């Protein structure tokens, strides 16, 4: 499948600092955030005009699920648009607090762990053909996902009883299973719950919940692009060396704690391989595969960055990728800070900096400041992100959903939507079922809109 439907779901961390005597719990802060949403959507679980879903998840975490995208730059742009949507809610909520005499600054973090050790996720969704053997996909994909922290981890300072240590991944410490149907209780790497949000006879949806939330656009593109390419190669019958892991959960932690990528990881049957060895195998197959695949500039950019990052890890010289990979950008920032102020990695100020890197408020968040200074590369533009806040992807089913929502809201009509249904809540209860996520034009939807 060379054209693939993809999406990213991001849960955001919430905290608030108060200036007066009045204090609010995280639950109350989250409700303030969603008050504007509830006022027009009558719910804290809504679909937006850009086709995305916005809702309050368990544990007061706002969650933004992008609309269906069929290209990498489109997905990166819509992922960033989610940050803007949440930032707008943040500004509105702070104003509401002020109007009620509650002085406070709300913070939304696009990260994966809070100071209490709770974890929340960034989930990737990939449409795959039903005909394939799912166990083969998960067998080949699992070693890739366990070791891809080397190329797309967000980086984290982990405080251990002995010392503070810099790790590749925020999520690695919180994953407890390889493949499972649960998402919260056991936190697997691949979630097998079969909800295709499409024609179930043709497709299923691969739900990957092991990834870090990335601030860097180029890292997001590499994370999703490399996984999508590996899926495409599996579907095309490309043969990979067997890197079945003896214990994926132990391996994911070992890989996260080794910035050199050289630490041996135990494979099934007693063999060993390093994270770098494993990533090199997938990368080599990708380079070969591109020779036979029809040209695609975005995929070529992904493979180029993949190779440069593996070279950087191998040589431990990160100069050629230090604006493109989250954990590399973050580590360089910490090192400069430590050198300037002569401080240890365990200093609380470094932990504050770690958190501030993921603050999504422009002008305050550290990543935003790095980006403005040219220290973090761009894939998209501010104008494209602003457009994506209100406009759905034009090449997928999201276009139908977005146009239906816009028309219904402007006509003042009551409606219900989900990923596959568009329904007018009138006497006729007219409903259109959109089972094909690739389809952006549908006469039935046009008629439904025209009838408003």
Curated annotation (Swiss-Prot):
Keyword Chloroplast: no
GO biological process: modification-dependent protein catabolic process; proteasomal protein catabolic process; protein pupylation
Residues binding Mg(2+): 9, 55, 63
Cystine pairings recorded for this chain: none
Residues binding ATP, per UniProt: 53, 66, 419
EC number in record: 6.3.1.19
GO MF entries: ATP binding; ligase activity, forming carbon-nitrogen bonds; magnesium ion binding; ubiquitin-like protein transferase activity
InterPro entries assigned to the protein according to its UniProt record, in alphabetical order: Pup_ligase (IPR022279), Pup_ligase/deamidase (IPR004347)
Top EC class of this enzyme: ligase
Reactions mediated catalytically: ATP + [prokaryotic ubiquitin-like protein]-L-glutamate + [protein]-L-lysine = ADP + phosphate + N(6)-([prokaryotic ubiquitin-like protein]-gamma-L-glutamyl)-[protein]-L-lysine
Alphabetized UniProt keyword annotations: ATP-binding, Ligase, Magnesium, Metal-binding, Nucleotide-binding, Ubl conjugation pathway
Pfam family, one: Pup_ligase
Active site: 57 (proton acceptor)
Pathway as given in its UniProt record: Protein degradation; proteasomal Pup-dependent pathway; Protein modification; protein pupylation
Keyword Transport: no
PANTHER family, per the entry: PUP DEAMIDASE/DEPUPYLASE, PUP--PROTEIN LIGASE
Function, in words: Catalyzes the covalent attachment of the prokaryotic ubiquitin-like protein modifier Pup to the proteasomal substrate proteins, thereby targeting them for proteasomal degradation. This tagging system is termed pupylation. The ligation reaction involves the side-chain carboxylate of the C-terminal glutamate of Pup and the side-chain amino group of a substrate lysine.
Family statement: Belongs to the Pup ligase/Pup deamidase family. Pup-conjugating enzyme subfamily.
Other known facts: The reaction mechanism probably proceeds via the activation of Pup by phosphorylation of its C-terminal glutamate, which is then subject to nucleophilic attack by the substrate lysine, resulting in an isopeptide bond and the release of phosphate as a good leaving group.
Protein name (record): Pup--protein ligase
Organism: Mycolicibacterium vanbaalenii (strain DSM 7251 / JCM 13017 / BCRC 16820 / KCTC 9966 / NRRL B-24157 / PYR-1) (Mycobacterium vanbaalenii)
